[in-house]
A protein has these predicted regions:
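Vicinal oxygen chelate
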Residues: 1-15, 25-26, 31-86, 90-119, ...
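Short acidic-aromatic low-complexity motifs
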Residues: 18-22
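C-terminal catalytic core of tyrosine-transesterase DNA break-rejoin enzymes
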Residues: 122
Length: 152
């Protein structure tokens, strides 16, 4: 087996449940300019799975069906996805123009990064961050009341 025969993926690939595979793929491509690994899409009666590339990151989207997957309504809420892009302001303008539900406008964070927050078409929260701006932890300008490190 050669390297070209192997699936290329990062060490961690999050999986997010959705109710409509095709609509979700279209939304990510149109609103966030992400790309599907088309050759890897799987479908089955009532469901499917697709792998989505966001820069060098990879995640998959799942729709429950007859494969024994967990029903989307039973998934615990509270997960936020973070993805890095080259230009937060440009990404924000595009997502907003495409009708994305914006939670917060682009802003500079105490860690040096620039971010905005947005909900996707099914209400999952995404934090879009600008690549190459995050400072080392010892250089963060912490807001009042926030401490660094493990409490003693």
């Amino acid at each position: 087996m050669t390297n070209s025969d192997l699936w290329k993926a990062p060490d961690l690939v999050p999986s997010i449940q959705y109710s409509d595979l095709l609509r979700t793929i279209e939304w990510f491509e149109r609103v966030f300019c992400f790309h599907e690994r088309v050759e890897a899409r799987l479908t089955w009666p009532g469901g499917g799975r697709a792998w989505i590339e966001a820069g060098s990151a990879l995640f998959n989207i799942n729709v429950a069906g007859e494969t024994g997957q967990q029903d989307a309504s039973r998934i615990v809420q509270g997960v936020k996805m973070k993805v890095y892009v080259d230009d937060v302001d440009q990404h924000f303008s595009h997502a907003k123009a495409e009708g994305a539900k914006i939670i917060s406008d682009p802003e500079d964070g105490f860690w040096g990064g620039r971010i905005y927050r947005v909900l996707d078409h099914e209400g999952h929260q995404w934090e879009i961050s600008q690549r190459g701006r995050d400072l080392a932890a010892d250089r963060w300008r912490l807001p009042p009341g926030v401490t660094r490190g493990v409490p003693k």
